[in-house]
């Protein structure tokens, strides 16, 4: 019974995160519309509320293209794996009801975020383009450099909280 409740809770968490991201993009588009002195995306429904769902339908019905000489499987699997890794990070967040019990939640957070680096590199490599590969390697270098400082700051906070 506890497994079913944690599964339902994690599914509800994932759905809420994805819907909130969709509405944050709607908020961003509205704010940019007001900044540029034009109306934002308010043509669909009441004040543009169904706009994220219309954007999702448009996104899923688009034609899928891929580079001719690319590694097709890893080219499409790496962004999906990156999405799953970013959603796994939400599992270690503390809520009122504990979904999963993590003794080392900070280490799980650092591991999931550091694994996300490799998906960018695999996506750049699998496109079989030198520019995409260089961009992926640049993103890996930037992400590793900020993760080292993030880990050091986190360990320093942990150390000072124990004193």
Swiss-Prot record:
Substrates-to-products reaction catalysed = a ubiquinone + NADH + 5 H(+)(in) = a ubiquinol + NAD(+) + 4 H(+)(out)
Q: What class of enzyme is it?
A: translocase
The UniProt record lists the EC number as 7.1.1.2
Query: What residue ranges are annotated as transmembrane?
Result: 3-23, 77-97, 104-124, 143-163
- Localization, UniProt: Mitochondrion inner membrane
Kindly list the GO molecular function terms attached to this UniProt entry. NADH dehydrogenase (ubiquinone) activity
Keywords, comma-separated and alphabetical: Electron transport, Membrane, Mitochondrion, Mitochondrion inner membrane, NAD, Respiratory chain, Translocase, Transmembrane, Transmembrane helix, Transport, Ubiquinone
Primary subcellular site in the record, as a coarse category:
mitochondrion
- Cellular compartments per GO CC: mitochondrial inner membrane
Q: How does it sit in the membrane?
A: Multi-pass membrane protein
Q: Which GO terms describe its biological process?
A: aerobic respiration
Q: What does it do? A: Core subunit of the mitochondrial membrane respiratory chain NADH dehydrogenase (Complex I) that is believed to belong to the minimal assembly required for catalysis. Complex I functions in the transfer of electrons from NADH to the respiratory chain. The immediate electron acceptor for the enzyme is believed to be ubiquinone.
Which family does this protein fall into?
Belongs to the complex I subunit 1 family.
- The name under which this protein is listed is NADH-ubiquinone oxidoreductase chain 1
């Amino acid at each position: 019974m506890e497994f079913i409740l944690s599964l339902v809770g994690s599914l509800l968490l994932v759905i809420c995160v994805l819907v909130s991201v969709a509405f944050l993009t709607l908020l961003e588009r509205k704010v940019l519309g007001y900044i540029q002195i034009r109306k934002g995306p308010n043509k669909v429904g009441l004040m543009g509320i169904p706009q994220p769902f219309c954007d999702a339908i448009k996104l899923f019905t688009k034609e899928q293209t891929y580079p001719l000489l690319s590694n097709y499987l890893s080219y499409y699997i790496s962004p999906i794996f990156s999405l799953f890794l970013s959603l796994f990070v939400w599992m270690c967040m503390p809520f009122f009801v504990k979904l999963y019990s993590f003794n080392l939640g900070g280490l799980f957070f650092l591991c999931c975020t550091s694994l996300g680096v490799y998906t960018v590199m695999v996506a750049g490599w699998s496109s079989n383009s030198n520019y995409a590969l260089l961009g992926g390697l640049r993103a890996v270098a930037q992400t590793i450099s900020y993760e080292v400082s993030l880990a050091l700051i986190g360990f320093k906070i942990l150390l000072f909280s124990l004193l």
